[in-house]
């Protein structure tokens, strides 16, 4: 009588187990590979922010928002973030300051330093002048432009390295009732007036300059007129373009069926696909000092500052360490 060898079925079972274990779900175990594929598709995309590679690769390949329920607020689908380190150099900046002239900017709700009420336009004009003059003292090669936004967008002051030239256009402004916010028109104007630098190697060669847009915005929540065109997408993906925001909102919680200022703030934040922009929100009925503090934090050079979530403005991380830390020269 012949007896079958016990090893034969065991080997077949092992092979079946190996084959059944091969198809595994996609994981985040290789974020570097995912980033390499993204870099090949978008060679000009860049970011010097850190600690966000895995989260970015997890979102890759899911641009569709059809699974979400019907909602009137349309937020652009999140784009995959690509981590490319840029040289942390203090190269010249071309700063385009965009000032909202909606009627909300003229409401006397902010608390000034002496306790009286003032409006956001008055405080914004002062903090913009202080910002421009301070940046000019840091580096006289910085250039500044002023754009005002109501129903339309107007380029008041061209790029100049003379702060007096911009400040001469800053104070003769009037607010108006605005029905819409043409965000697409604003970015299209910036693209027409500005040339974005290109380098042979983003990671090692410093750019001749960087372009930064600072939007001071104050309106009730409303869906902006905006569609992400291909030229606009390239602008946001450019490693030398930065979009900073100071959003002055009413601070009130709207009803559930209405749009909230938080929705608008999230919408503006979703435009930054590199994680390099800074965004601040200030209540319209709060102290004016908060607006000044936001503008002071924007003085840092975009290539030298960390991502906003890592930024710290305290001298000491822990109050308990105050007695242990000594200044050394």
From Swiss-Prot:
GO terms for biological process: cell division; DNA repair-dependent chromatin remodeling; double-strand break repair; mitotic G2 DNA damage checkpoint signaling; positive regulation of DNA repair; response to ionizing radiation. The modification Phosphothreonine is found at residue 65. GO terms for cellular component: BRCA1-A complex; BRISC complex; cytoplasm; nuclear body; nucleus. Residues 10-19 have a biased composition (Acidic residues). It is found in: Cytoplasm; Nucleus. Residues 95-298 are annotated as: VWFA-like. Residues 1-86 are annotated as: Disordered. InterPro entries: BABAM1, vWFA_dom_sf. The modification Phosphoserine is found at residues 8, 29, 49, 57, 62, 66. Keywords: Acetylation, Cell cycle, Cell division, Chromatin regulator, Cytoplasm, DNA damage, DNA repair, Mitosis, Nucleus, Phosphoprotein, Ubl conjugation pathway. The modification N-acetylmethionine is found at residue 1. It comes from the Eukaryota. Component of the BRCA1-A complex, a complex that specifically recognizes 'Lys-63'-linked ubiquitinated histones H2A and H2AX at DNA lesions sites, leading to target the BRCA1-BARD1 heterodimer to sites of DNA damage at double-strand breaks (DSBs). The BRCA1-A complex also possesses deubiquitinase activity that specifically removes 'Lys-63'-linked ubiquitin on histones H2A and H2AX. In the BRCA1-A complex, it is required for the complex integrity and its localization at DSBs. PANTHER family: BRISC AND BRCA1-A COMPLEX MEMBER 1. Component of the ARISC complex, at least composed of UIMC1/RAP80, ABRAXAS1, BRCC3/BRCC36, BABAM2 and BABAM1/NBA1. Component of the BRCA1-A complex, at least composed of BRCA1, BARD1, UIMC1/RAP80, ABRAXAS1, BRCC3/BRCC36, BABAM2 and BABAM1/NBA1. In the BRCA1-A complex, interacts directly with ABRAXAS1 and BABAM2. Component of the BRISC complex, at least composed of ABRAXAS2, BRCC3/BRCC36, BABAM2 and BABAM1/NBA1. Identified in a complex with SHMT2 and the other subunits of the BRISC complex. The VWFA-like region is similar to the VWFA domain. Its presence reveals similarities between the structure of the 19S proteasome and the BRCA1-A complexes. Belongs to the BABAM1 family. This is BRISC and BRCA1-A complex member 1.
